[in-house]
């Protein structure tokens, strides 16, 4: 017999519509009865795909379902690449939820509700045999996700490497 692990999210069925809050939404959001949410489903436990490889799950998905319930709408999370979510809010998506870092540039495009704060870290081979120093990445190959603040930070560090006459950082940007 095989065993299977299933993901169970937060039960939002008891959340009631708040008519006063729902009345604040524009018709462009409410007209189809669905809150359409863009999310990069590669960032567990916040947003990722269930075992079926199709169903978005995670605490951000639970949060978007709760928000939709308060609005009196159905919720649909659509898997997207991280760098395409913010530009698509207001056209393809009613909102984006994907552990965004709030930046001045992003605030020029969309409004944010901050409910979560996380840091960044570098991952190296066990034991750090190449003695990678995160304060000096010049000449090191670094992989980052496209469109993230980490990509911006590594690009900024790379400019400093060049300005200092050091080897460039080999930046490997990917949509993951």
Regions found by a protein language model. Give the residues of each.
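N-terminal Sec signal peptide cleavage junction
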Residues: 1-2
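Extracytoplasmic small-molecule ligand-binding "clamshell" domains
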Residues: 6-11, 15-96
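Phosphate-binding glycine-rich loops and adjacent basic patches that engage nucleotide phosphates
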Residues: 23-33, 98, 113-118, 142-147
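Soluble periplasmic/extracytoplasmic beta-strand elements of cell-envelope proteins
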Residues: 36-38, 45-48, 76-78, 111, ...
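Short, solvent-exposed loop/turn elements at domain surfaces
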Residues: 44-49, 105, 151-152
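Short amphipathic alpha-helical segments
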Residues: 50-51, 109-110, 155-156
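Bilobed "Venus flytrap"/periplasmic-binding protein-like clamshell domains
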Residues: 56-69, 100-102, 119-176
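Acidic, polar ligand-binding/catalytic clefts
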Residues: 74-136
């Amino acid at each position: 017999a095989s065993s299977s692990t299933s993901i169970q999210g937060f039960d939002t069925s008891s959340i009631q519509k708040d008519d006063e809050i729902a009345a604040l939404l524009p018709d462009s959001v409410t007209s189809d009865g669905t809150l359409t949410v863009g999310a990069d489903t590669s960032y567990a436990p916040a947003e990722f795909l269930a075992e079926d490889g199709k169903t978005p799950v995670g605490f951000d998905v639970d949060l978007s379902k709760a928000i939709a319930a308060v609005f009196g709408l159905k919720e649909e999370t659509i898997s997207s690449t991280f760098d395409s979510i913010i530009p698509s809010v207001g056209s393809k998506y009613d909102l984006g939820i994907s552990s965004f870092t709030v930046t001045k540039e992003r605030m020029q495009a969309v409004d944010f509700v901050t409910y979560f704060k996380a840091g960044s870290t570098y991952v190296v081979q066990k034991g750090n045999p190449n003695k990678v120093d995160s304060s000096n990445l010049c000449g090191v190959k670094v992989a980052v996700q496209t469109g993230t603040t980490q990509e911006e930070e590594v690009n900024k560090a790379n400019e400093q490497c060049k300005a200092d006459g050091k080897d460039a950082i080999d930046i490997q940007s990917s949509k993951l």
